[in-house]
Amino acid sequence: MSLKIQTSNVTNKNDPKSINSRVFIGNLNTAVVKKSDVETIFSKYGRVAGCSVHKGYAFVQYANERHARAAVLGENGRVLAGQTLDINMAGEPKPNRPKGLKRAATAIYSGYSFDYDYYQDYFCARLFDYRGRLSPVPVPRAVPVKRPRVTVPLVRRVKTTIPVKLFARSTAVTTGSAKIKLKSSELQTIKTELTQIKSNIDALLGRLEQIAEEQKANPDGKKKGDSSSGGGGGSSGGGGSSNVGGGSSGGSGSCSSSSRLPAPQEDTASEAGTPQGEVQTRDDGDEEGLLTHSEEELEHSQDTDAEDGALQ
């Protein structure tokens, strides 16, 4: 069986070796954490020569300075019993340590046997007594800010500027109404032009339909004319034969008459045919020109309508 050696409660030796190997444990919840718990936590870093637990803090005395510094590095900032421990070397005061703890540590080093509980109670009593004697800091009153009053000349200036703004608005309204009237008149003229163009297009389409119907009917009429001219030549030939049976003079006369009669018909047909073709080609060219002109007018009217819509 291994017996656990109890450590001493002496942690206030003034020799330099003891001071440099002593560890201060601050912000310790002494209501929950006991001396045995502190010894078990810090004994893993080296041999603990002494341990003393007080209200809110404790001291651990190591036999070697190296063990003390290892404990500070390993346990500083550890959360124990819901509180973060503030651990550092007792011989090296920390700047951010509370004033009460610093004075307690210096008081420890001043004497060999010192009652820590008495010192802590005395220090707290003096601290609260000093705070009670301090006068409260007076709170400065808020200085009321005075708002500048509106002067009369400013009001007059505002009144003088109002008619200018109204005049500018009225001029803008009149110019806008004039532009609207101009746009409406332009739209009316464009509408009338469009109606005229549509009527012209309708007339041209009707004319084209009539020409197409006439062209369809013309080939049949030409064939009928050719057949009638052929029948007339045969009849004239029969007459010539009869005249030949009657006499030579009659036969010669009939031959000459038959040979002379078709020539004027061919001339008349050719004369009649050529002007009709020329007239048809001219009519077709005129109609195509009118169609192209009407299409251009339609495109121009559409462009103007689009521009008017964008302006509106």
Swiss-Prot record:
Residues 214-226, 293-303 have a biased composition (Basic and acidic residues). There is a cross-link at K4, K94, K99, K159, K165, K179, K191 (Glycyl lysine isopeptide (Lys-Gly) (interchain with G-Cter in SUMO2)). Keywords: Acetylation, Coiled coil, Isopeptide bond, mRNA processing, mRNA splicing, Nucleus, Phosphoprotein, Ribonucleoprotein, RNA-binding, Spliceosome, Transcription, Transcription regulation, Ubl conjugation. It is found in: Nucleus. This is RNA-binding protein Raly. It comes from Mus musculus (Mouse). The modification N6-acetyllysine is found at K44, K165. Residues 214-312 are annotated as: Disordered. Residues 184-216 form a coiled coil. Identified in the spliceosome C complex. Interacts (through its RNA-binding domain) with FUS (through its RNA-binding domain); both are components of the same RNPs. Gene3D superfamilies: 3.30.70.330. Widely expressed. Expressed in brain, testis, lung, spleen and kidney. Weakly expressed in liver. The modification Phosphoserine is found at S135, S270, S294, S301. SMART domains: RRM. GO terms for cellular component: catalytic step 2 spliceosome; nucleus. The modification N-acetylserine is found at S2. Pfam families: RRM_1.
